[in-house]
UniProtKB/Swiss-Prot annotation:
GO terms for biological process: inositol metabolic process; phosphatidylinositol phosphate biosynthetic process; ribosome biogenesis; signal transduction; transcription antitermination. Gene3D superfamilies: 3.40.190.80, Fructose-1,6-Bisphosphatase, subunit A, domain 1. PROSITE patterns: IMP_1, IMP_2. This is Nus factor SuhB. Keywords: Chaperone, Cytoplasm, Hydrolase, Magnesium, Metal-binding, Ribosome biogenesis, RNA-binding, Transcription, Transcription antitermination, Transcription regulation. Belongs to the inositol monophosphatase superfamily. Substrate binds at residues 68, 85-88, 182, 211. The gene is suhB. The keyword Magnesium applies. It is an enzyme of class 3 (hydrolase). The lineage of its organism: Bacteria, Pseudomonadati, Pseudomonadota, Gammaproteobacteria, Lysobacterales. It is found in: Cytoplasm. Homodimer. The rRNA transcription and antitermination complex (rrnTAC) consists of RNA polymerase (RNAP), NusA, NusB, NusE (rpsJ), NusG, SubB, ribosomal protein S4, DNA and precursor rRNA; S4 is more flexible than other subunits. Its cofactor is Mg(2+).
Amino acid sequence: MQKPAVNIMVKAARSAGNVLLRHINKLETLHVIQKSRMDYASDVDEMAEKVIVKELKRAYPDYGILGEEGGLQGNHRIMWVIDPLDGTSNYLRGFPHYCVSIALVENGEPTDAVIFDPLRNELFTASRGAGAVLNERKIRVANRKDLNGTMLNTGFSPRERSRAHAQLKCVDALLMQAEDIRRSGSAALDLAYVACGRADAYFEAGIKVWDVAAGMLLVREAGGYVCDFKGADAPRMDDKGPESCQLIAGNIKVAHALQQVIVSSGYGREFDPKR
């Protein structure tokens, strides 16, 4: 049985997903703002976030909210971390790969997570200590023992483009062992796919915390491991934590092997969490 908070999160995520689907054939009418290079927001992002916030605030008025569009509001100790549309660039181009991501964070750690893909009607949920689920089916990370034959997911953060040479060096080294490396444009779905075994691992520097808060818990509850590029614990999700981070996620053996290649390539060495 799901926790009451997760039920509310699911309701909010499905409502936001409906907003995304209602506007998918009206993309040319949307007002789009370019916040920075390769970082966009649209009317749909704002509408979806408002739907989520309304639903969550109705049930839990005292919890804080950290949203991609609205920033940090209220209580830092217990808060919702929201990305109403992870994969905005995909959505705006009609590329069918994006999702809604919601996490409940207590004292800097995600305790509950929901990622909803409205196009495929795939609902990923997790609660700390209770495992991870895709559409009512328990999921687990893949059980590979090393990088050989792995399918890896990554992203190219617009905040790290000046150091792209290091990431490309890392990709070059990984392709000597991995089967393939994918760049889908939705970090939350990348992590959800790691959690259910569709991908073996995910790595990226410069990713925003609201993109990965829910996905981190999904991977952990699916038996996986999450760390930064130095092998340390993933960042706290509160007012003391960074806005962006480095992240590796997968089963523990693949994550450790991936981390060694990342370190040797120099990728992320000059990463600034304030960027």
